[in-house]
């Protein structure tokens, strides 16, 4: 019987840690392939264990600023919808005041890890994509509950150097060596293929790299922008 893995992504940390991927592969046109991201690290765990791993759930935790004057949330809303509809993620998004977003993410992520750990047969291995030492108490509890832990970190996240080294060794919260995001940069990079799609509005076919669930041709997008500026 395969081991069940559940992935927990600290969206705030992952956004900041893109700098490590930029440094590895260049900033221009770099995008993360969110559909591949959890699978890449579950496959790595499977290779370490030399047994099958079943990815049962990917949880993404993020925020939307509620107190920033004039801030348009439509782009973030569309991104979170994309994670759910196209990548199969479960998202937990909080409206927060600017400056307190990370605390909400940390509390929600830790609570969710422990909640599912308490459900019989929900998962065997927790894969944490994030590396703040604030997670150490929750990760220790997971191990006491018989769960195994894999930490996915970055060597530089904009604030700290190698924080996960301290997290996994000093606090003894991981069962596996830390996996480094920058070492898997090429694997998690989104490579867009050009395909022909039909416009949802007019039915016209056009070549595009857009992979979202709905596609609108350049003419329809242009007319929409024109009306929006009128």
Residue map of PLM features:
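Domain-level signal for Mg2+-assisted phosphodiester chemistry and nucleotide/NA-binding surfaces
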Residues: 1-103, 144
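Nuclease catalytic cores that cleave nucleic-acid phosphodiester bonds
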Residues: 81-228
């Amino acid at each position: 019987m395969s081991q069940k893995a559940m992935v927990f992504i600290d969206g705030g940390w992952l956004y900041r840690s893109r700098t490590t991927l930029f440094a590895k592969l260049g900033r221009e046109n770099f995008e993360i392939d969110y559909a591949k991201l959890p699978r890449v690290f579950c496959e790595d765990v499977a290779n370490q264990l030399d047994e099958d791993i079943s990815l049962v759930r990917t949880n993404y935790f993020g925020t939307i600023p509620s107190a920033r004057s004039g801030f348009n949330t439509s782009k973030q809303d569309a991104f979170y919808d994309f994670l759910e509809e196209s990548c199969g993620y479960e998202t937990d998004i909080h409206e927060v005041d600017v400056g307190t977003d990370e605390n909400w993410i940390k509390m929600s992520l830790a609570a969710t890890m422990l909640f599912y750990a308490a459900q019989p047969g929900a998962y065997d291995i927790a894969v944490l994509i994030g590396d703040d030492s604030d997670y150490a108490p929750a990760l220790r509890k997971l191990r006491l509950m018989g769960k195994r832990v894999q930490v996915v970190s970055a060597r530089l996240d904009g604030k700290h150097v190698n924080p996960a080294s301290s997290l996994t060794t000093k606090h003894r919260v991981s069962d596996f060596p830390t996996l480094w995001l920058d070492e898997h940069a090429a694997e998690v990079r989104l490579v867009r293929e050009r395909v022909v799609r039909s416009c949802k509005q007019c039915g016209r076919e056009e070549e595009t790299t857009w992979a979202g669930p709905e596609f609108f041709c350049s003419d329809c997008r242009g007319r929409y922008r024109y009306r929006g500026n009128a």
